[in-house]
């Protein structure tokens, strides 16, 4: 029962944070330390529940996705959409494959997450103040190949635990001239191949036999992550039509500073 409760908590954390610019990986590391949810199963669990979050995006955009897949002839709207997503996917995919092992071995710690949270927060504030109201593109369908590549290059920052894939791609979108909402929508679509590839790679490397209780925990985490992420995606897009990203930046700063203090006091290692 204790494992199922932890799975429920971690599923909520993943669903709440995956598509907000506050780093799901960072929060999973931090919360996992506090509730003592660590080890090989925890690592695989965190990978699997990301699939729940991916499915939430697919479900939210199901009409647009299905419409785009009906016509993939070169030059068509559907082809252009997924070609641009593919271009944006390449930089993080290549660099991620080359650095995956090093990152897992050396950067998955509360302290490095705290530094990334703070650095990302400062970048979010500066970029929004500088580019937030200068956008020329208010629809992700208007993004061209060069801008897609710029967003993809920005996504490389998210390989550093705590930086946030969502924050990195939204900031990249704003630098490319997109409105915050258009950047967020592009980020959501880019999440589909990016997270699916990362999850598949990690599962191929780390999947192992599990007990019945562990299978139940996976199911609880997956479903909880899906339902929570589905709620967050809808509300976050509505929020961005009227509000700033700065509250998320201030939250990142607060959590980052708190984590550094906890590490310094050896409360968290």
From Swiss-Prot:
Database matches in InterPro entries: UppP (IPR003824)
Entry GO MF terms: undecaprenyl-diphosphatase activity
EC number: 3.6.1.27
Keyword Chloroplast: no
Pfam families: BacA
Keyword Transmembrane helix attributed: yes
Keywords: Antibiotic resistance, Cell membrane, Cell shape, Cell wall biogenesis/degradation, Hydrolase, Membrane, Peptidoglycan synthesis, Transmembrane, Transmembrane helix
Catalyzed chemical reaction(s): di-trans,octa-cis-undecaprenyl diphosphate + H2O = di-trans,octa-cis-undecaprenyl phosphate + phosphate + H(+)
Regions crossing the membrane: 41-61, 78-98, 107-127, 148-167, 184-204, 213-233, 248-268
Family listed: Belongs to the UppP family.
Described function: Catalyzes the dephosphorylation of undecaprenyl diphosphate (UPP). Confers resistance to bacitracin.
Protein name per Swiss-Prot or TrEMBL: Undecaprenyl-diphosphatase
């Amino acid at each position: 029962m204790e494992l199922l409760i932890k799975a429920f908590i971690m599923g909520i954390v993943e669903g709440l944070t995956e598509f907000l610019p506050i780093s799901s990986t960072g929060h999973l590391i931090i919360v996992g330390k506090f509730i003592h949810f660590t080890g090989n199963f925890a690592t695989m669990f965190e990978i699997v529940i990301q699939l729940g979050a991916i499915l939430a995006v697919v479900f939210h955009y199901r009409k647009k996705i299905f419409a785009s897949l009906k016509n993939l002839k070169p030059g068509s709207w559907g082809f252009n959409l997924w070609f641009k997503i593919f271009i944006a996917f390449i930089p993080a995919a290549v660099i991620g494959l080359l650095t995956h092992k090093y990152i897992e071995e050396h950067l998955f710690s509360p302290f490095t997450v705290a530094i990334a949270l703070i650095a990302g927060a400062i970048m979010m504030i500066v970029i929004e103040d500088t580019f937030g109201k200068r956008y020329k593109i208010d629809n992700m369908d208007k993004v061209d190949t060069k801008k897609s590549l710029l967003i993809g290059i920005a996504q490389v920052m998210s390989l550093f635990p705590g930086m946030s894939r969502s924050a990195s791609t939204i900031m990249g979108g704003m630098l490319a001239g997109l409105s915050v909402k258009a950047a967020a929508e592009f980020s959501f679509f880019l999440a589909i191949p990016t997270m699916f590839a990362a999850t598949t790679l990690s599962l191929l490397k780390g999947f192992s036999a599990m007990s019945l209780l562990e299978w139940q925990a996976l199911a609880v985490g997956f479903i909880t992550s899906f339902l929570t992420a589905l709620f967050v995606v809808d509300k976050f897009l509505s929020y961005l039509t009227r509000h700033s990203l700065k509250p998320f930046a201030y939250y990142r700063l607060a959590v980052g500073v708190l984590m550094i203090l906890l590490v310094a006091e050896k409360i968290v290692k």
